[in-house]
Amino acid sequence: MRNEQEHETALKLRLADIPVQVTSRYGMLEKICLPYVDGRGDAEPLFAVRASDADLDFERAMAPEFSNPYLESCAVHRALAERFASHERIVFHSCMVEYAGRAYAFAAPSGTGKSTHARLWMQHLGDAGAKVLNGDKPFLHVPQEGAAVAYGCPWTGKEGWGYNGSAPLAGICVLHQAPTCSIERLDPAGAVELIMRQCYVPRENPAGTLAVLGCVDRLLTRVPVWSMGCDISEDAVRTSFEALTGTEYAGCSCNK
């Protein structure tokens, strides 16, 4: 039998540079959130989140095979996404790779290969050169003025890739499988539907929906979006690297 004993713990976190309070009812949520405990300690949380029994039931209706600890994690993530929209933050389903101080998002439907492509970057560019900021659901801050910023968060996907950090978002690459590698830059009109598919949009919250649309509109004017067909060869790394970074790919820098 799975251990689902409740023990509530209130955690003051800093997520996407916003102080929030998250109450954990089960140990799983507390464990994944610990790296994000607010070390400054002087900022009052802007809001508090706790998953109710009704929230767990909502998640269970979509995924009945999972335990309460896992469902709580999903419910709290959903609640944060709902609240973050009004603070110019969105959840962007992607694998976010940091390289040379900038973040690059690889987006695709689940199972298409975004994690595989990120792994290729780490393999061919070296662990010290490319690392995953968040492997599944990074937060993006898209302010009214200035650069969009990608943030790590506790929800890191099945690979568990990620860390508490941030970097300016310098490019988005939407992947699809293909026998040969090719890439093209999309204009905002051509990219908007692809980008919206990767964003969490608040449920039954018109103001939150409008806030997400505003973030996406600003994102598309500031961050280049690429559509790439790729395989799993080193040529895939070369193709995306040169387009996204604007620099020549010099070959594998990993330790032989």
Where are the language model's segments positioned?
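Glycine-rich, often acidic-flanked micro-motifs
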Residues: 2-34, 66, 86, 93-95, ...
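Core catalytic alpha/beta fold that binds nucleotide/phospho-ligands
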Residues: 30-37, 48-50, 54
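Post-Walker A alpha-helix
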Residues: 117-118
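Extreme N-terminal, non-catalytic leader segments
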Residues: 45-102
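Conserved glycine(s) of the Walker
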Residues: 113
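Walker A/P-loop nucleotide-binding motif
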Residues: 110
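Acidic-aromatic/histidine active-site loop/patch
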Residues: 2, 39-43
